[in-house]
């Protein structure tokens, strides 16, 4: 078979002194970190959509990329050609996983019948590619936001026929994910929100979205899918306000519909930025709420109000993210999917490799910094000492419901409590983190 990336055999680890731009300097899949292979900690995935579907177009210009599989021709044949290039890329990049939306891998067609037939054929192609390459599916999902029919949302659409079309896509994509051995299924509500409250019934739309999620959970159990269901929070774009705004908002939504034990979160760094949060905050919040599942690893631009989907390159924040994930026990079914794209001016086909290689090295360094933090344990000890009082008699009686509000007030009066503020020592802790980051 003719190769597309014909100037490259495979990206390999060459060590930190390497000057080869098509080699890893820090990501060594077999290196042991806290007793586990680096590849097994990080569980990298490359995404289909930004890497093979985007043509370089933006709001002010047409596509700038020359991708042979995006040329005019038979749609199904172009999809197969795209799959050839995609799996060549996955293999040469040395990623163990990939992710897709339904219409990333298969032509949508002009009807539901065409959609289903095309997707069924491409699932056969993908299954064969997976078997040949050893690359596995981290997660699949359905694109229920691009087609004009979804202008007013999919699950939250005022037309139940649109809801039904979306439900068909979701059930088909879930079945495909299950058939391909996918380890998760993602729900991202690209247009599940509103642009103006003047024509929006908030209660109605929340009920519709909640019902779709309940149906998804029911179908998961019906088909015996053992993977994890994930929601990917995002505050806005393309709508003004989305119902899955951030980790905390999604938790409240899931609680409302009794789904908090059925669905977890896929946290994206850039979406955290858009919500006014740090990536670290959203990961820590998801873990605290028992909802952490997987990560879309990228970065946004704090000076821009949209999803820039750049490759991660900030070890300072990503190390803290990996530290939180380490403390939570690491990934189970989730992983680090690079929901990132090269810039519109990056028109060389090997730019796809440069972006992913830099991102993988960044996350590898972040992993090793986080491991140093875990091994040293000082940051954890500082936090434990700060809350130590809650492990004492008073703290435990309050938390365990053994004291009423009046009991607590009586205790404070009887013991003449006069507590004094203790320093949070933020500056010292920031210096400690810098020690892990920069001291060898």
UniProtKB/Swiss-Prot annotation:
**Biological process terms in GO annotation:** D-xylose metabolic process
What species is this protein from? Klebsiella pneumoniae
The record lists the catalysed reaction(s) as: alpha-D-xylose = alpha-D-xylulofuranose
Q: What assembly does the database describe for this protein?
A: Homotetramer.
Which InterPro entries would you find in this protein's record? Xyl_isomerase-like_sf, Xylose_isom_bac, Xylose_isomerase
Q: Which family does it belong to?
A: Belongs to the xylose isomerase family.
Cell compartment(s), UniProt: Cytoplasm
Q: Which residues bind Mg(2+) 2?
A: 268, 271, 307, 309
Question: What does the entry list under GO cellular component?
Answer: cytoplasm
Q: What are the entry keywords?
A: Carbohydrate metabolism, Cytoplasm, Isomerase, Magnesium, Metal-binding, Xylose metabolism
EC category name: isomerase
The catalytic activity of this protein is classed by the Enzyme Commission as 5.3.1.5
Which residues of the sequence carry a binding annotation for Mg(2+) 1? Answer: 232, 268, 296, 339
Full protein name: Xylose isomerase
The active-site annotation reads 101, 104
- Single GO MF annotation: magnesium ion binding
List, separated by semicolons, the cofactors it needs: Mg(2+)
Q: Which gene encodes it?
A: xylA
Domain of life, source organism: Bacteria
Say where the protein is mainly found: cytoplasm
The cofactor remark states:
Binds 2 magnesium ions per subunit.
Q: Which PROSITE patterns match?
A: XYLOSE_ISOMERASE
HAMAP family cross-referenced by the UniProt entry: Xylose_isom_A
């Amino acid at each position: 078979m003719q190769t597309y990336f014909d100037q490259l055999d495979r990206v390999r680890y060459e060590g930190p002194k390497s000057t080869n731009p098509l080699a890893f300097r820090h990501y060594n899949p077999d290196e042991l970190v806290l007793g586990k292979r680096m590849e097994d900690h990080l569980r990298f995935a490359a995404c289909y959509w930004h890497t093979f579907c985007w043509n370089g177009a933006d709001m002010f210009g047409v596509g700038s990329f020359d991708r042979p599989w995006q040329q005019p021709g038979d749609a199904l044949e172009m999809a197969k050609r795209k799959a050839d290039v995609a799996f060549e890329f996955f293999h040469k990049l040395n990623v163990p996983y990939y992710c897709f939306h339904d219409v990333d891998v298969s032509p949508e067609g002009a009807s539901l019948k065409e959609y289903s037939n095309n997707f069924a054929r491409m699932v056969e192609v993908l299954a064969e590619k997976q078997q040949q390459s050893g690359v596995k599916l981290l997660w699949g999902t359905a694109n229920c936001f691009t087609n004009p029919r979804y202008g007013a949302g999919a699950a939250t659409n005022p037309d139940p026929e649109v809801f039904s079309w979306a439900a068909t896509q979701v059930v088909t994509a879930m079945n495909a994910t299950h058939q391909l051995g996918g380890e998760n299924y993602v729900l991202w509500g690209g247009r599940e929100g509103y642009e103006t409250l003047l024509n929006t019934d908030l209660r109605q739309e929340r009920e519709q979205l909640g019902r779709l999620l309940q149906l998804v959970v029911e179908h998961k159990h019906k088909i015996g899918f053992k993977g994890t269901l994930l929601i990917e929070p995002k505050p806005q774009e393309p709508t003004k306000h989305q119902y899955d705004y951030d980790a905390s908002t999604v938790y409240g939504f899931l609680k409302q519909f009794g789904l908090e034990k059925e669905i977890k979160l896929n946290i994206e760094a850039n979406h955290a930025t858009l919500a006014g949060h740090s990536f670290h905050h959203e990961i820590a919040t998801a873990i605290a709420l028992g909802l952490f599942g997987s990560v879309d690893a990228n970065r946004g631009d704090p000076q821009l109000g949209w999803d820039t989907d750049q490759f991660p390159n900030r070890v300072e924040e990503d190390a803290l993210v990996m530290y939180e994930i380490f403390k939570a026990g690491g990934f189970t079914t989730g992983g680090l999917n690079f929901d990132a794209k090269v810039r519109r001016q990056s028109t060389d086909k090997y730019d796809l490799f440069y972006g992913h290689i830099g991102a993988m090295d960044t996350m590898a360094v972040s992993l090793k910094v986080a491991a140093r933090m875990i091994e040293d344990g000082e940051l954890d000890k500082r936090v434990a000492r700060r809350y130590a009082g809650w492990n004492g008699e008073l703290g435990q009686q309050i938390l365990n419901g053994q004291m009423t509000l009046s009991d607590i007030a009586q205790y404070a009066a009887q013991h003449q409590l006069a507590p004094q503020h203790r320093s949070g020592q933020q500056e010292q802790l920031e210096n400690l983190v810098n020690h892990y980051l920069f001291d060898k």
